[in-house]
Structure formats: C-alpha cells, structure tokens
Amino acid sequence: MTTSSNPMGSSFKTTIERYCAHFNWQVAEATEEYAKLQFTMESQRRQTVYILRYESTLEFDVPSMAAFDSEEQIPHQLSTILLKRSAQRKVGFWCIEEIGGKHVYSYMHNVNCACLIWSILVWVSVPSLLKWMILRASF
C-alpha cells in the first residue's frame, strides 16, 4: 500500500473525509490505507463498506451478514448462485473472505485510482456505485 498524495493534492484520508462530508456519510475510520464507512439501510440494518487503497487500485468491500465458522458450513448452493450472478455483472463480484476468523460472503469491486476516485467523475459515480454494491450485498 502507499501513502502518497493523489493527483488532486489531497491525501486518501482527506479525500475520503471531504467526499463523505459532502454526502453526509459517516466515516467510522479513515487512514491513508483504508476507510470504513457505515450506512443505515432502509431496513434499519447497519451496513459497513470498506475502501482499501493499494498502490494504484481501490478495493470496495461490502461484507454481507452471511458468516460461517468453517468452510464445511458454507452453503454450496448459495455459493453457486452468487458465482453465477458475478458472471452476469460487469461491475463487482461475490467472494468469500476471512473476517475475524469467519468465512463471510462479500461483494467487492476493484478499480484503478486514475479511473475513478481521483477523477471528476467520482463525484457522480461513487454514490451510485456504493448504493448499487450495498443493494447487491443484501440477499
């Protein structure tokens, strides 16, 4: 990961904080490497979105509520459905990641920083992208 400034002259943390303040979004945590955003869904459920910064890539990670103690407990039929959905979509993908010792279904999207976050398009694209990803992460 890198902590260098972006082409707009602000650090990753500052850019995320300013952007979220503009949309009245809550930043739970932010560093130069990642940000943790939290939203309240229409169902009143709290949803977390992580934005991880790598050298030239941002990873948007939306963990679902589906978490399992072992690989044996993962419902393979659901995994098959989610893999098929991933194949049908142009943006984002389903995966299983380890979080806190559990196997969690998560929806992710990776994007080159130059193509999204540090461009002017970010001010239009990211709210829609995050909402779209959060909706996809809800079963």
Question: Where are the predicted features?
Answer:
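Well-ordered alpha/beta subsegment
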Residues: F93-V126, L130-A137
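Hydrophobic residues embedded in beta-strands of well-ordered beta-sheets
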Residues: A35, L58, H103-Y105
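Short, well-structured hydrophobic secondary-structure segments
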Residues: E42-A67
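Conserved short hydrophobic interaction patches
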Residues: Y19-H22, I81-Q88, V124-S138
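Ordered, soluble secondary-structure elements with a strong preference for glycine-centered loop motifs
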Residues: N6, S10, E72, C115-V122
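Short beta-strand-to-loop capping motifs
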Residues: F39-M41, S64, H109-V111
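Charge-rich, low-complexity N-terminal segments
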Residues: M1-V49, Q88-R89, E97
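Short, internal acidic amphipathic alpha-helical interface segments
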Residues: D61-V104
